[in-house]
């Protein structure tokens, strides 16, 4: 029988990375909110770790957003590590493609509770609890931005290691990837009980035997990253049973909203309906939202939506003064997927094949 313990698994913090797909205004509270979003998300990771009294936080790569990490981002990261350390939480980290080992770093001292895996070989570090080994954590970092080798094949579990955790920043998408490509079979062959992966920004549990988990990123950054973002709280029982709980950490959420235009004949009616749904969305998520509005269906508004001027007018009407709200819901894009209405009676009168098809449908009416 082993020892019960728990940890937070997060990855891809991308501290300081600016949002894409949105133009920030020159004034209003949202400028500051967007600028601090990635930092606030990591604060919420540490909050969750402290509130749940976990034994460790595992960070599986890409703490920063590039080889040259800003000093402010490094100081903010160190500040949160010290906060976790004060709560008795151990930190285990591997470097990824956005924060490789050779990247510049300021000489900022980190707590003794921070363990960073080297890039030269897979190493193991015990996770201690109450003076006893609760688990063994294996990991390897990126030395450079691109790693074409299959690093998963370098992991080998040792005997008597208790619960074994592997940490790797990897792309399971294909052998030609420059981001430590591997397969699920490669990971399973290492004999780990839990794989704490990073690199993929959408959370995904690849396997439950053993657990192979991507937590996704902690804060959405663009329209490609729709929906809740966060980390996993992982509870490991005395007999090695694993329980996952997803914890939302994003402070601003990217969302899709789909509207069928069939019920509306006037632009003002559509704007009113969207505004009403926006209010419900704010209440549902409890945080600011950046929204892609997708219009579908058919009706009189198809002509408005099919023109760029029409779409711009709707967006401007929806966003008027919204940037001055703390709990904003900003429509960043309007996608027209509507179609023109079809009048079957008129079509039947056409002499060509366009009219013959609806004529043939009369027998079903």
What does each of the following model-derived ranges do?
Residues 20, 26-28, 56, 67-243:
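His/Asp/Glu-rich metal-coordinating catalytic cores
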Residues 4, 53, 133-136, 191, ...:
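Short loop/turn motifs at secondary-structure junctions
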Residues 39, 43-50, 75-78, 152-156, ...:
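Amphipathic, non-transmembrane alpha-helical secondary structure
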Residues 1-74:
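N-terminal active-site segment of His-dependent metallophosphoesterases
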Residues 249-365:
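Accessory, non-catalytic peripheral segments of nucleic-acid enzymes
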Residues 1-30, 229, 235-260:
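Domain-start "cap" segments at the beginnings of catalytic or binding domains
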Residues 60, 198, 296:
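Conserved residues at the C-terminal ends of beta-strands
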